[in-house]
Amino acid sequence: MRPEDDRVYDVIVVGAGHAGIEAALAAARMGFRVLVLTVNPDTVGWAPCNPAIGGPAKGVVVREIDALGGEMAKTTDETMINVRMLNVSKGPAVRALRAQIDKISYSRTMKRKLETNPNIVLRHGIVERILTEKGRVKGVVDNYGIDYLGKAVIVTTGTFLRGKIFIGRSTFPAGRMGEFPATKLTESLIELGFEVGRFKTGTPARVLKRSINFSVMERQDTSDEPLAFSFFDEPRVLPKDYPCWLTRTNPETHSIIKQYLEFSPLYGTVKLIEGIGPRYCPSIEDKVVKFKDKESHQVFVEPEGRDTEEYYLNGLSTSLPYEAQIKMIRSVKGLENAIVTRPAYAIEYDYIDPRQLYPTLESKLVENLYFAGQVNGTSGYEEAAGQGIIAGINAALKLRGEPPLILKRSEAYIGVLIDDLVTKGVDEPYRLLTSRAEYRLLLRHDNAHLRLAKYGYRVGLIPKWFYEKVLSLERRINEEIERLKKVIVKPSDRVNDLLTSLGTSPLKESVSLYQLLKRPQLSYSALKFLDPNPIDDPEVVEQVEINVKYEGYIQKMFEEVAVFEKYENYEIPHDLDYDAVPNLSTEARDKLKKIRPRSIGQAMRIPGINPSDISNLIIYLDRKKQ
């Protein structure tokens, strides 16, 4: 018998990608002993596709993870080499940060953070079997036959479940390029009753810096404004040493792709790929086939880090044979002499139907077994990390005997993501978009900590000083808004000349600074000339401007949320006998039995359930309460 401390843990995390890291750190920081098993401990938090974190919706998720006490934002700040705020010219609801990271440094930093946490053991091992006893998880067994016992298990296997790589008609098993797949764990999950599907994704080739002609490409430098993902970090301006570059495909590129389509594992005469690929991150052959009228597509040439000369060709993801790849790449302006260091490839992998999970990400089939990340049918590092921290927090809360953390759609993009997964399921790799969030004006990049720090503090992942800093910010925002309402500006030649010069109409009667700030042409800084006591706090000013200018829209959304909350708070007993509910359609009855929504609100979002089904369900539940 092995020593107990080598065999028995509180929480076992399977996989050390972006989901596994956040799950492990959350559970460990909440006081539990955590074992992290991974195929390769040297590729912790690896970025196998684009060397970037953030983007529309995704960047907000990174801020939400930070507000809950996670690590992705801090490590991005530590290792980023180029960062920009996207959609600056648009409204605050769609603004988000995106950073190029030094992917090698990011991975090493995350590995160090796992290894230096006294509650975490990071160990090599490919998990092959989930151990259960009386419907509850008991532990895992790895490829060496070594068993580990745990009170909770979190599966974060990414693309490793029966992973298979495709380059043209060449195919071989792999979790990602150069790493073994997990070939047997899927069988164990199927034996436990899980429904499993197959998805595919892909990554472009990497090319050597010295072979790129940057002089004919459009340069994209890091921001001149100080920026940071984490609220803990001081925003800073990065040196302009690692720009990204923009070029485009052309008719010759598309001609080469069409010429080799018959050798594509997706489009070719021999169809090798069964899995469905990501709609919002299509391969270049997908784009050429589906958008025949487009003469060119963007290609972003992105640095992979400080200590590597490899560049990532964002926009040229493909599974065509290498002969096609080199010709296609060299047809692109600036890449005529490109030296390929790694070929592009597609990878097919297993995922579980996420409708088999509760909103806590615990499975409905096996108690204390959680799933997070790409194994749930999502795509993207940020989506994975967001699920990871929720799974880690909820596993720890359950072991503590405390209520779970379930973020609402009106509270966080992470809430939207998980609700979509467990309610609607997936028929393609799921990517978060701003359009998926009906309350996106409330779920902004700038207010993530105001929304969520209370939960991070409640579960013990946010220190008291930080939470007090957030509360102080909230208080100062409210105080400044109230002050602006009290400062009255009277019409005068000086005032009206200033307003006219700023492109807005002159005053005919006295108004408050609050009312003036509502005008789209006027910023807080522009009103300083009319304000006896303006504040000089950029964080407060940003929040004040947004809250004042968008007050009508924000208020309308809060009213919608109030209606939403009414149905969200109308709980449905988990053991409800849906066969006893009269007048339900057959489709509604089947779906309600399968998903077992926790509330009327969640039931309303299940595809195929119509308003009359909901009415009949409410009538039945109301009668049961009487």
From Swiss-Prot:
Keyword Flavoprotein: yes
CC annotations in GO: cytosol
Cross-referenced InterPro entries: FAD/NAD-bd_sf, GIDA_C_N, MnmG, MnmG-rel, MnmG-rel_CS, MnmG_C, MnmG_C_subdom, MnmG_C_subdom_sf
One Pfam family recorded for the sequence: SAM_GIDA_C
Subcellular location: Cytoplasm
Signal peptide per UniProt: none
Entry cofactors: FAD
Domain of life, source organism: Bacteria
Binding, NAD(+): 277-291
SMART domains, sorted: GIDA_assoc_3 (SM01228)
Gene3D superfamilies (UniProt xref): FAD/NAD(P)-binding domain, GidA associated domain, C-terminal subdomain, tRNA uridine 5-carboxymethylaminomethyl modification enzyme MnmG/GidA
Binding site for FAD: 15-20
Keywords, alphabetical: Cytoplasm, FAD, Flavoprotein, NAD, tRNA processing
GO molecular function: flavin adenine dinucleotide binding
Family: Belongs to the MnmG family.
Subunit structure: Homodimer. Heterotetramer of two MnmE and two MnmG subunits.
HAMAP family the record matches: MnmG_GidA
Function, as annotated: NAD-binding protein involved in the addition of a carboxymethylaminomethyl (cmnm) group at the wobble position (U34) of certain tRNAs, forming tRNA-cmnm(5)s(2)U34.
Protein's name according to its UniProt entry: tRNA uridine 5-carboxymethylaminomethyl modification enzyme MnmG
Native organism: Thermotoga sp. (strain RQ2)
